From Swiss-Prot:
Belongs to the TRAFAC class translation factor GTPase superfamily. Classic translation factor GTPase family. EF-G/EF-2 subfamily. Pathway: Protein biosynthesis; polypeptide chain elongation. GTP binds at residues 26-33, 158-161, 213-215. Its main location: cytoplasm. Disulfide bonds: none annotated. NCBIfam families: small_GTP. The gene is EFT2. This is Elongation factor 2. It catalyses: GTP + H2O = GDP + phosphate + H(+). SUPFAM superfamilies: EF-G C-terminal domain-like, P-loop containing nucleoside triphosphate hydrolases, Ribosomal protein S5 domain 2-like, Translation proteins. Its EC number is 3.6.5.-.
Length: 842
């Protein structure tokens, strides 16, 4: 039990080589918070009896009630290692005390934006996987996010007690299950890994995989067993480690190692991992769970486990817990992995600097980040806001990448749209206090050097969700985080009592601060809209809004899905519009963009800020565009970065460049609110074929060109088989065989399509993957539990946009009904307009 003081932690912060910033990531319900407990308990914050049940990191009331993690929480732990262990660390260290900043993150798909925020400020990740369920959809999503941020993973195979007690597997089966899990994690890692990370795969024989049970509080790595045996038999530990995993067998008769599973007489040999590692565990389990009172003491003596008198009275699971905790304490295995194999900020920032910093990679700030230099100018990234106990105020939670942050220091707060040399999105303020985040509490500290995680007081009014804090005006921003989910479900909120309106507006501001992925805006009809990533996320946001941020009763509409407008063919004829003064004409045609190009734009592979030559190269090589056309992309829309393009295909038009700005502005407007029902437009390319302009500049100003360009964009889209795209979830359901029928019937009712169904080897569970339209997903998990008697648990994650079949202009078709309902809600004419409304005859 290490009782440590804040001063000790503060001293360790200066030895950056001994700091480890890591987050715990996994699929929902694989036991992240439970595992974190054993680490927190080791640091002496909760009692050993509580560990595994306390879920110390679930700080909110609704987290405790639902038993899920919603927000990521941070805590600092202190660990000291033996000198032998420290020698094995492959990087520079200083002494044998270590400071571990640990962030427990949510596993639920709806909150994966919280995970992104946690990953940005850490360098290593503890990936937790359930032995029985194996690698699931969310494991893959978070691992992909982590590797994209250049974060090094180590693996924990959790819930081993389930395999032993529920499934009663044999030793060889268990080894195969472990091997399969490790292999599937490595497949994901090798698919998404960044070459700068080097080999990021995990290997049990190198000590980067731990096996254990968070609930019972025990875990082990192959390295720990190798240590035991090397002391006992006097063999070299490194050799022993290699032999304890994979195809190596020990022949007790000849005392020789072989890699064949039979000896000379053809008798089967036992795998070394089973014999030396699993056997003692299996024996303990068997003796204790079958109440063999006489065998237990001899076993305990052999394994050098000493029980107190009152502990000897226990039996069954209670005894098992105590014994396993003494035999293989989880904290030892996890701390050893974290300290030995995860990088320190000094190591990590050397290869993460260019992915973190937006400016040139050779300027002084990037160099300071690369060297993790505490004496340079301050560079601090705020990744999220944490609400304080005092209503309406937030701690800014982030990491110092260079320099030192002090209380009272004068700083520049740069929002995500800031560019050096301009004044927008920039505040000059001073920091009131710096604090250390400790799970449910905070501790004040005077300053915090580079490489550490910190909370700041007094900057929350000037940042929306994330941003960069510096002390030098030449510094660029740190890169903005990319979220793997997008807000697709929205509701309108209104107050029950008109006097409360200002409170609602204030509450919405606070809500959008406290959650990295919620979107709040005001629609044209004056409604306040809150958009979230899914049903659960929205539910949590609204309960926060009602109880914390606004603190007033609200009326909440039914959830509505955000659609996109698109086209399915080229315009059937050239669309033409004339300006209000009849002196200018624009001729255009619309054509659909391939889904692959749209995805590349949305994922930032094709970027409006790239050099146009580089962009044309990608479009030509990867997507087969004509190079001349690809170079003439005028703009992306909406918001200057959406998946719609204006391409200039005109020949020798006079004054063309003068109207470019007006055309771009009009296109942003037209794609933000499409012609069908005022939703965002997606995958539309507008080709400008010809423009006739008035010779006199005053007759071709913005007031003439902007409305014309917008009308002609609408006309060209309505001439090109307009359609609606709806968002589609990928659903993954794990269930026993007898529940599959129920799943299919629910999916059929809700327009779902099953993509795959497979059995997990070695378990009775099936995994069903299906596509489910977001529109149909409300109440889906409730219906599913009813149909399967509560045995199926769905995971929904936004996957893609799919075109709704049917004619939009026909008011009886499915898209027609949706368009009509939306238009009525917005107070427009209920019919979708024909192209004649925007098309002008010559």
């Amino acid at each position: 039990m290490v009782a440590f003081t804040i001063e000790q932690i503060r001293d360790l912060m200066d030895k950056v080589a001994n700091v480890r910033n890591m987050s715990v990531i996994a699929h929902v319900d694989h036991g992240k918070s439970t595992l974190t407990d054993s680490l927190v308990q080791r640091a002496g914050i909760i009692s050993a009896g509580k560990a595994g049940e306390a879920r110390f990191m679930d700080t909110r009331k609704d987290e405790q009630e639902r038993g899920i993690t919603i927000k990521s929480t941070a805590i600092s732990l202190y660990a000291s290692m033996d000198d032998d262990d420290v020698k094995e660390i492959k990087q520079k260290t200083d002494g044998n005390s270590f400071l571990i900043n640990l962030i427990d993150s949510p596993g639920h798909v709806d909150f994966s934006s919280e995970v992104t925020a946690a990953l940005r400020v850490t360098d290593g990740a503890l990936v937790v996987v359930d032995t029985v369920e194996g690698v699931c959809v969310q494991t893959e999503t978070v691992l992909r996010q982590a590797l994209g941020e250049r974060i090094k993973p180590v693996l924990v195979v959790n819930k081993v007690d389930r395999a032993l007690l529920e499934l009663q597997v044999s030793k060889e089966d268990l080894y195969q299950t472990f091997a399969r899990t490790v292999e599937s994690v490595n497949v994901i890692i090798s698919t998404y890994v960044d070459p700068a990370l080097g080999d990021a795969q995990v290997y049990p024989d190198k000590g980067t995989v731990a096996f254990g049970s968070g609930l019972h509080g025990w875990a082990f790595t192959v390295r720990q067993f190798a240590l035991r045996y090397s002391k006992k038999f006097g063999v070299d530990r490194a050799k022993m480690m290699e032999r304890l995993w994979g195809d190596s067998f020990f022949n007790p008769k000849t005392k020789k190692w072989t890699n064949k599973d039979k000896d000379a007489d053809g008798k089967p040999l036992e795998r070394a991992f089973n014999m030396f590692v699993l056997d003692p565990i299996f024996r303990l389990f068997a003796a204790i769970m079958n109440f063999k009172k006489d065998e237990i003491p001899t076993l305990l003596e052999k394994l050098e486990i000493n029980l107190k008198n009152e502990e000897k009275e226990l039996e069954g699971k209670a005894l098992l817990k105590v014994v396993m905790r003494k035999f293989l304490p989880a904290a030892d295995a996890l701390l050893e992995m974290i300290v030995l194999h995860l990088p320190s900020p000094v190591t990590a920032q050397a290869y993460r600097a260019e992915t973190l910093y937006e400016g040139p990679s050779d300027d002084e700030f990037c160099t300071a980040i690369r060297n993790c230099d505490p004496k340079a100018d301050l560079m601090l990234y705020v990744s999220k806001m944490v609400p304080t106990s005092d209503k309406g105020r937030f701690y800014a939670f982030g990491r110092v990448f260079a320099g030192t942050v002090k209380a009272g220091q004068k700083i520049r707060i740069q929002g995500p749209n800031y560019t050096p040399g301009k004044k927008e999105d920039l505040f000059l303020k001073s920091i009131q206090r710096t604090v250390l985040m400790m799970g449910r509490n905070t501790e004040a500290i005077d300053d915090c050097p580079a490489g550490n995680i910190v909370g700041l007081v007094g900057v929350d009014q000037f940042l929306l969700k994330s941003g960069t804090i510096t002390t030098n005006e030449a510094a660029h921003n740190m890169k903005v985080m990319k979220f793997s989910v997008s807000p697709v479900v929205e509701v309108a909120v209104e107050v029950k009592n008109a006097n409360d309106l200002p409170k609602l507006v204030e509450g919405l501001k606070r809500l959008s601060k406290s959650d990295p992925c919620v979107k709040t805006y005001m629609s044209e009809s004056g409604e306040h809209i809150v958009a979230g990533t899914g049903e659960l996320h929205l539910e949590i946001c609204l309960s926060d809004l009602q109880n914390d941020h606004a603190g007033i009763p609200l009326r909440i509409s039914d959830p509505v899905v955000a659609y996109r407008e698109t086209i399915q063919a080229e315009s059937s004829m050239v669309a033409l519009s004339k300006s209000p003064n009849k002196h200018n004409r624009i001729y255009v045609k619309a054509q659909p963009i391939d889904e692959e190009v749209s995805l590349d734009i949305e994922n930032g592979i094709i970027n409006p800020r790239d050099d146009f030559k580089a962009r044309a190269r990608i479009l030509a090589d990867k997507h087969g565009w004509d190079v001349a056309e690809a170079r003439k992309i005028w703009c992306f829309g909406p918001d200057g970065n959406g998946p719609n393009l204006v391409v200039d295909q005109t020949k020798a038009v006079q004054y063309l460049n003068e109207i470019k700005d007006s055309v771009v502005a009009a296109f942003q407007w037209a794609t933000k609110e499409g012609p069908i029902f005022g939703e965002n437009v997606r995958s539309v390319r507008v080709n400008i074929l010809d423009v006739t302009l008035h010779a006199d500049a005053i007759h071709r100003g913005g007031g003439q060109i902007i409305p014309t360009m917008r009308r002609v964009t609408y006309a060209s889209m309505l001439l090109a088989e307009p359609a609606i795209q709806e968002p589609v979830f990928l659903v993954e359901i794990q269930c026993p065989e007898n529940a599959i029928g129920g799943i299919y019937s629910v999916l059929n009712k809700k327009r779902g399509q099953v993509v795959s169904e497979e059995q997990r080897p070695g378990t009775p569970l099936f995994t069903v993957k299906a596509y489910l339209p977001v529109n149909e997903s409300f109440g889906f998990s409730g219906d599913l539990r009813q149909a399967t008697g509560g045995q199926a648990f769905p995971q929904l994650v936004f996957d893609h946009w799919a075109v709704l079949s049917g004619d939009v202009t026909d008011p009886t078709s499915k898209p027609g009904i949706i368009a009509k309902a939306k238009r009525e809600r917005q107070g427009l004419k209920p019919e979708v307009p024909g192209y004649e409304e925007y098309y002008d005859k010559l």
